[in-house]
């Protein structure tokens, strides 16, 4: 798995907090939600380390990077704690109560900021999970990850902190940020919907086999936008650059974006970037793992 936004073991940091005075865009419920403020600097994190209720989590697929070095006081959360398998579908959201209980055990309550860093796709998938739970207005990304943190003089540790004080967390699930196969099939031909495929060109074309994808190719009408193009030199691109990439793929202010990939992991990076830019966006969690397994649904393969 590619690690970005990192040197020395940590990739990407998300700080759950909205900054006042930033540009805003409509969210799915018609309320005002932050379109900027998702990206912050190491200096910003340094100046907020003592904020009441601040929780720092490292999101990883294995424990090794955390044990090697982590932001002092950070707690480890594994991808398997916020994803689950449903039958043949490899990566799905666990039950809401399971997620809520786990986050409460990590010291997350209804106030305070949460900082996430770790392997890039582990972090963007966690961003999506928290956004689904209604915490999106508290989310930001510290560009540069642990490398930026240490360069700014931030304290690094190797031992885990004491157990967190359990908090009470109120969640407000947002089904409008999710898409399933039925929704995608019903809306994929609509002019106001843009399907973005986060996989490589070879996977999109169907010339490269993928584990768990019964029929190689892509969903008809989808546009390929490799998730790695969101990044440069270990950081998310500037908003202007991201905007140009999305515009070139067909995104406009009036369209709803649906991201997908193989199992819903790489799609979360496009989901994060779309949220950063203020687009209405859904993530098709089952992605090609589910879609290609439904023989009644069409798949385009370039030969």
Residue ranges of each PLM-predicted region?
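Positively charged n-region of N-terminal signal peptides that target proteins for export
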Residues: 1-4
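Bacterial N-terminal signal peptides
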Residues: 8-19
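Flexible, polar/low-complexity N-terminal or interdomain linker segments that lie immediately upstream
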Residues: 14, 23-64, 143-212, 299
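Thiolate-centered catalytic microenvironments shared by cysteine-dependent enzyme domains
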Residues: 27-34, 93-182, 187, 217, ...
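Solvent-exposed loop/turn segments at secondary-structure junctions
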Residues: 61-64, 80-83, 119-123, 146-148, ...
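Active-site-surrounding "flap" and adjacent substrate/cofactor-binding loops of secreted or lumenal enzymes
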Residues: 69-82
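Helix-loop module immediately N-terminal to the HCX5R catalytic loop
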Residues: 84-110, 226-257
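A mid-sequence, solvent-exposed acidic-amphipathic segment
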Residues: 189, 195-236, 245
């Amino acid at each position: 798995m590619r690690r970005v936004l990192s040197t020395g073991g940590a990739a990407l940091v998300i700080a759950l907090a909205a900054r006042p005075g930033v540009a805003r865009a409509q969210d799915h419920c018609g309320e005002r939600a932050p379109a900027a403020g998702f990206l912050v600097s190491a200096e910003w994190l340094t100046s907020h380390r003592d904020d009441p209720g601040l929780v720092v989590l490292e999101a990883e697929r294995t424990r090794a990077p955390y044990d090697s070095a982590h932001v002092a006081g950070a707690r480890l959360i594994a991808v398997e704690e916020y994803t689950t398998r449903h039958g043949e579908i490899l990566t799905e959201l666990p039950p809401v109560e399971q997620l809520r209980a786990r986050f409460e055990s990590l010291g997350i309550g209804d106030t305070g900021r949460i900082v996430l860093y770790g392997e890039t796709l582990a972090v963007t998938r966690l961003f999506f999970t928290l956004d689904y739970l209604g915490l999106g207005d508290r989310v930001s990304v510290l560009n540069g990850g642990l490398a930026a943190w240490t360069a700014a003089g931030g304290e690094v540790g190797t031992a885990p902190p004491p157990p967190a004080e359990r908090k009470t967390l109120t969640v407000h699930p947002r089904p409008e940020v999710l898409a399933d196969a039925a929704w995608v099939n019903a809306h994929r031909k609509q002019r106001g919907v843009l399907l973005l495929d986060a996989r490589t060109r070879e996977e999109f074309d169907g010339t490269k086999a993928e584990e768990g994808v019964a029929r190689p190719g892509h969903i008809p009408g989808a546009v390929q936008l490799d998730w790695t193009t969101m990044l440069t030199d270990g950081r998310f691109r500037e908003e202007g650059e991201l905007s140009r990439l999305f515009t070139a793929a067909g995104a406009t202010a009036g369209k709803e974006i649906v991201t997908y990939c193989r199992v819903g992991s790489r799609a979360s990076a496009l989901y994060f970037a779309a949220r950063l830019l203020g687009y209405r966006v859904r993530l098709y969690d089952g992605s090609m793992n589910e879609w290609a397994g439904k023989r009644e649904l069409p798949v385009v393969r370039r030969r």
